[in-house]
């Protein structure tokens, strides 16, 4: 059964019967009536409350079978009810997803992207949530006090994420020197084809898992080759993988990205630090462009007027917060693909990040990795992430490389780094310029 057919069947099963529609969404007509009763007083209001209570009781009466503990990510529809999407099914929409009533969503203030563990029983539509056990690992009552992500105060990244792991892994050592990453960074890896971006992403994820065990690592793969998805799942068993391969529909690409970002937001609200890798924001923008085209006006490269609105919003979710956690997003942007659309996407998004790691195809063609253009790579406000003495010595290195061609600069940088067991030891050996 295709994803599209499954999704349509779910929507039909939730709305085709009038009795079902009244139970799930209280009916279009009764919703309007209840809205009027809320505004008024007297008998109308009590009648509306009585009707709602009767419908809530109907849910309980129709349940049968033993209570079973299940869990998944909550996805709320525009009509107020929701479903738990299961990790084992790659968060796809299926007919046996756990149904969450509008009353439970309202009473507990549930939001998209929450990881919910609950007791369920069989209802006439399938499994239905009957009792919340925990929300994002917390007691359901504690969750009610959580702030909203949009209300959190965003500040500059000021806590560095150390990426260096071993002496011979030059990828992460070079990033620590040239484009350091902090908690809440919004970074772009600007990558031509076959320049080593997938390897860099994998090394970054492994570094965070090894060096920062308290940080939740998430990987979002959009319109990716199926074998790449399988390889990353195998290589990163401790990361949460959200993937849509290129044999899936466009709507699935958009949907899985929104689920992943909402999941990350809910973790930040709970005070956790999240590190997300996104591959790629270019393909995500293409997906939203195709999903929302519908014959509307197009601009340069075939992009519709509002095609980049949602990708920009998702990428902009990366931030360091003052009173809660942080969301770091490192996304890849594809360039030199002979596509006017890809070039336009990069031009529109490059100003939204605060860190860039630029890969160079001419360096990669010489089999020099990581194929980084040192002069075009860097982090804004890196002085907030580095101790003053390290920042000064890294500035000395950059000045020493100035005037070289990019391929000469990376060769010289790597040859120096190979002589020392760590970056710290290398920086100690550099004499300050007084």
Label every PLM stretch briefly:
Residues 1-67, 73-75, 80-81, 88-96, ...:
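Charged, low-complexity terminal tails
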Residues 93-102, 165-171:
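Short, structured beta-strand/loop micro-motifs enriched in basic residues and often containing a Trp
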Residues 104-117:
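Short nucleic-acid-contacting surface segments enriched for D/E, G, S/T with interspersed K/R
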Residues 122-189:
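P-loop NTP-binding catalytic core
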Residues 187, 195-196, 204-208, 212-434:
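P-loop NTPase catalytic core
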């Amino acid at each position: 059964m295709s994803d599209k057919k499954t999704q349509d069947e779910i929507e039909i099963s939730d709305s085709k019967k009038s009795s079902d529609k009244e139970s799930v969404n209280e009916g279009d007509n009764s919703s309007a009536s209840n809205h009027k009763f809320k505004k008024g007083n007297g008998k109308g209001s009590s009648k509306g409350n009585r009707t709602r209570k009767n419908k809530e009781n109907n849910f309980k009466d129709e349940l049968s079978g033993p209570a079973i503990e299940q869990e998944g990510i909550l996805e709320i529809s525009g009509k107020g009810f929701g479903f738990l999407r299961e990790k084992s099914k790659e968060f796809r929409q299926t007919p046996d997803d756990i149904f969450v009533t509008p009353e439970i969503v309202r009473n507990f203030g549930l939001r998209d992207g929450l990881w919910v563990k609950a007791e369920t029983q069989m209802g006439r539509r399938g499994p239905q949530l009957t009792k919340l056990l925990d929300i994002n690992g917390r007691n359901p009552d504690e969750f009610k006090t959580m702030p909203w992500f949009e209300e959190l105060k965003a500040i500059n990244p000021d806590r560095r994420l150390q990426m260096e792991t071993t002496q011979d892994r030059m990828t992460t050592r070079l990033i620590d020197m040239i484009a350091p990453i902090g908690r809440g960074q919004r970074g772009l890896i600007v990558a031509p084809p076959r320049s080593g971006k997938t390897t860099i992403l994998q090394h970054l994820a492994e570094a965070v898992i090894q060096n920062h065990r308290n940080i939740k690592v998430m990987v979002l793969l959009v319109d990716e080759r199926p074998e790449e998805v399988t390889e990353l799942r195998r290589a990163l068993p401790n990361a949460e993988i959200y993937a849509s391969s290129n044999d899936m529909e466009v709507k699935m690409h958009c949907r899985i990205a929104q689920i992943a970002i909402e999941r990350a937001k809910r973790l930040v609200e709970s005070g956790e630090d999240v590190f997300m890798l996104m591959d790629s924001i270019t393909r995500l923008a293409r997906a939203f462009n195709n999903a929302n085209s519908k014959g509307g006006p197009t601009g340069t490269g075939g992009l519709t007027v509002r095609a980049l609105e949602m990708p920009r919003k998702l990428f902009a979710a990366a931030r360091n917060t003052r009173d809660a956690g942080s969301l770091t997003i490192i996304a890849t942007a594809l360039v030199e693909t002979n596509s006017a659309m890809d070039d336009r996407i990069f031009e529109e998004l490059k100003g939204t990040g605060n860190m860039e790691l630029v890969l160079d195809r001419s360096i990669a063609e010489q089999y020099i990795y990581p194929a980084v253009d040192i002069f075009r790579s860097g982090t804004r406000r890196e002085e907030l992430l580095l101790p003053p003495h390290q920042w000064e010595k890294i500035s000395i290195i950059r000045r020493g490389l100035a005037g070289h061609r990019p391929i000469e600069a990376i060769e010289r940088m790597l040859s120096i780094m190979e002589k020392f067991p760590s970056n710290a030891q290398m920086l100690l050996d550099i004499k300050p310029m007084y």
